[in-house]
Curated annotation (Swiss-Prot):
It comes from African swine fever virus (isolate Pig/Kenya/KEN-50/1950) (ASFV). This is Protein MGF 110-9L. Glycans are attached at residues 242, 267. GO terms for cellular component: host cell membrane; membrane. The keyword Flavoprotein does not apply. Belongs to the asfivirus MGF 110 family. The chain crosses the membrane at residues 1-19, 128-148, 163-183. It is a multi-pass membrane protein. Pfam families: v110. Keywords: Glycoprotein, Host membrane, Membrane, Transmembrane, Transmembrane helix.
């Protein structure tokens, strides 16, 4: 009976703690939908999360900040999960690359995971020394594995112990191979994501993503096309915008970072030109529909 009473008291205390005004030391279990009273907090520091937006007909309006401009529904808005334990608040996004951020609930720091995700270095630096070191570790690991295999019958260990040893070795090999791959240069045949495509790919991208900044050389407000010499010189303006390009096997994609992030997917072998800038300018948002 005492145990039951004790459990009831604990449940009541938990309910009281969860109802405390935010921020506080109360716990918030991992959830996709934080309490309504906490939305302003979360949407200030995790502004890309889906629970901060109302989307309709492909156009999204911020739930908390009325003055926030309308945006087009795209990859900028991600499914998020948030939690709070003690004085630590955290959120992570279910994007292609998961982003996890922990911050102090009382002194939080803004973290724009989307900008970091899109900021890929123009030129990847190949860490030759790291690759050499990793290769030596791989050779040593393989030699150790061969030695263990030869001594397998002499080992006086249980089958489960042997299995764990081999699993550990294979895991180590996997980590070493991943380290090598991450330090290798990007190949034009491999999946990539970058702000500046390789020079040999410029003609392709500048044919179909002709408004992207990597296609132009600008000086004193005048811009000249890098690829097509017969293209007339144009004035530097909103026509030229920052872009991110990516290729995943047979699918090519570029995203223009305009006021509204605009994304276009196409077949790499049979691409289709899209005048995204003209379409974007013609895009009329009826706020009454939101």
């Amino acid at each position: 009976m005492k145990v039951i009473v004790f459990l009831l008291v604990l449940l009541e205390m938990q309910r009281v703690i969860q109802n405390q005004p935010f921020p506080g030391t109360g716990e918030l279990p991992m959830t996709r939908r934080p309490p309504k009273r906490e939305l302003e907090y979360w949407c200030t520091y995790a502004r890309s999360c889906d629970f901060c937006w109302n989307c309709r007909h492909g156009v999204c309006k911020n739930k908390v900040f009325e003055k926030h401009p309308l945006i087009k529904k795209n990859d900028y808005i991600q499914i998020c999960r948030v939690s709070r334990y003690g004085e630590k608040c955290s959120y992570f996004t279910d994007s292609k690359i998961r982003r996890f951020h922990i911050m102090s609930c009382t002194n939080p720091t803004y973290y724009d995971w989307f900008d970091e995700l899109m900021q890929v270095k123009e030129d990847r630096i190949i860490d030759v020394e790291n690759i050499k070191h990793t290769c030596l570790c791989m050779v040593a690991t393989i030699a150790l594995m061969v030695y263990i295999r030869k001594q397998y019958s002499r080992m006086r260990m249980q089958a489960a112990t042997r299995l764990l040893i081999f699993l550990g070795i294979y895991l180590l090999l996997g980590i070493l191979m991943t380290n090598i791959i991450m330090n290798l240069p990007l190949s034009t045949d491999n999946p990539m994501q970058m702000r500046r495509p390789p020079k040999e790919d410029l003609k392709f991208w500048c044919t179909y993503a002709k408004h992207c900044d990597f296609c132009w050389t600008c000086k004193d407000g005048m811009c000249k096309n890098k690829v097509f010499s017969d293209h007339p010189i144009i004035t530097q303006n909103d026509y030229i915008v920052n872009c991110t390009v990516s290729r995943w096997h047979d699918r090519c994609m570029y995203e223009a970072h305009f006021r509204i992030h605009y994304q276009h997917n196409m077949n790499c072998s049979q691409p289709k030109d899209l005048e995204w800038f003209i379409e974007l300018k013609r895009h009329v948002i009826n706020q009454d529909d939101l």
